[in-house]
A protein has these predicted regions:
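Catalytic histidine-centered segment of alpha/beta-hydrolase-like enzymes
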Residues: 368-377, 381
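Conserved acidic catalytic loop of the alpha/beta-hydrolase fold
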Residues: 160-180
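Conserved alpha/beta-hydrolase
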Residues: 131-148
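Glycine-rich "HGGG/HGxG" loop immediately N-terminal to the catalytic nucleophile
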Residues: 120-121, 143-156
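The serine-hydrolase catalytic nucleophile loop
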Residues: 115-127
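A catalytic-pocket lid/entrance helix-loop region that shapes and gates access to the active site
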Residues: 199-250
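Alpha/beta-hydrolase
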Residues: 237-323, 330
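Short beta-strand/loop motif that positions the catalytic acidic residue
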Residues: 328, 334-336, 340
Length: 391
């Protein structure tokens, strides 16, 4: 957080210096420009301009240093691995973290939610126990976090993630000399995981979906209706008015993020205050302040959630796993929070009934909402080990 504090301090000083420079510049112009009687004012203007320029370059230097010194904390074990790696995946520069107590353990790729979300630091904080049993890989997908500039936002599609996810899988298989890897997908990442195991079943042992997305358009309609229902019970008239003004989703255009946020944030707050949910909410400030992210990455942490989500999410409304992915050749398990009202569990149960897979199952987390991996992390780790390593 020292870098953040320094950056903010320098930014404030730069703004003050710029304002001083502008004020002095206006005074010089009013006084008739450079003249012998105005020389002291001109000298002050030059000093202010130089100071402003120096602060700007100093701040840029702080940003640059923060980017090149970003790292993931070491793991103190003889055969451990703890690295941030920049990869070229289909011509797009992207970042992953690799963490494990033994680099010979099975590889587990965690697919973050979003699109546009990064959980590189969050997974390290919440699921460090998994690092004793796997080489845990976190991938900042195109348009998120450290990989925000991997592709122009306007060019990103679901196919982009599928292609790059496959390329990343091939890299991991080759680097760690493993024929297959394991997948965990969270929220949007759970749908991406289904896409990957469907298209490339030979590359994956098994997959776990948590906060599983099934039908994106129906999910938005159900979430909207749930928010209206809760708001009506609570007498939240202002929210009801805003929801009705926005209309029933799905939304399209430039305001998808902001319109969706009205009911999604409301549902998140509801789950965060639910007495049946353990360890509720998200530790966003802890995560964005983590050392994996440089200052520019920290800014892009939020840009991905806003810009990438807005562009990509509206492309997903035609996807319904029940129709398009009813048969898979890889074992699939669903880790569901009993109180998840973000990804409606009724859709997951329906998909689970019709899904044809070598093995399938639903694991309920009785004290969780949309994020069992945060709400009940100890049980989450135990169930991952049970599904992946003990069968």
């Amino acid at each position: 957080m020292f870098q953040v504090s320094l950056f903010l301090t320098l930014t404030v000083l730069t703004i003050l210096a710029l304002m001083t420079t502008l004020v002095l510049g206006v005074r010089v112009l009013i006084a008739g420009g450079v003249s012998k009687t105005n020389i002291r004012l001109v000298v002050s203007l030059k000093k202010a301009a130089f100071f402003c320029l120096a602060l700007t370059f100093l701040n840029l230097g702080v940003v640059y240093v923060s980017q090149i010194t970003a790292s993931t904390p070491p793991i103190n074990a003889e055969n451990s691995i703890a690295e941030l790696v920049k990869l070229d995946l289909n011509g797009r520069k992207q970042w992953i973290s690799l963490r494990g107590h033994d680099k010979n353990k099975p590889v587990l790729l965690f697919l973050a939610g979003g699109p546009g979300g990064t959980q590189m630091a969050a997974v390290r904080h919440e699921l460090s126990e998994l690092e004793k049993h796997f080489v845990v890989v976190n991938w900042d997908q195109p348009g998120s976090g450290k990989s925000y500039y991997a592709e122009k936002t306007g060019n990103i599609t679901a196919q982009t993630y599928i292609e790059d996810g496959h390329a990343l899988t091939e890299y991991l298989k080759e680097r760690f000399s493993q024929e297959k890897i394991y997948l965990i997908g969270e929220s949007w990442g759970s749908a991406l995981g289904i896409f990957l195991v469907s298209r490339y079943p030979e590359s994956y042992h098994a997959m776990i979906g948590t906060g599983q997305m099934i039908d994106f358009a129906e999910t938005e309609r159900l979430d909207y209706a749930m928010a209206l229902e809760i708001a009506s019970k609570n007498g939240d008239d202002a929210l009801i008015k805003k929801l009705r003004a926005n209309g029933v989703p799905p939304y399209y255009g430039k305001d998808v993020t902001w319109k969706s946020a009205v009911y999604l944030n409301y549902l998140s707050r509801y789950m965060a205050n639910h007495p049946g949910i353990q360890n509720p909410g998200y530790n966003t400030f802890r995560d964005v302040g983590s050392q994996e992210y440089g200052l520019l990455d920290k800014i892009n942490y939020f840009r991905g959630i806003i810009n990438t989500f807005n562009h990509v999410y509206q492309q997903l409304y035609t996807i319904d796993l029940r129709k398009d992915y009813a048969k898979l050749d890889v074992p699939v398990y669903f880790f569901m929070g009993r109180y998840d009202i973000n990804a409606p569990t009724v859709l997951v149960e329906e998909y689970g009934r019709i899904l044809d897979a070598p093995e399938k199952g639903i694991v309920w987390f009785e004290h969780s909402g949309h994020s069992p991996w945060i709400n009940e992390r100890d049980k989450f780790v135990r169930e991952v080990i049970s599904c992946f390593l003990e069968d």
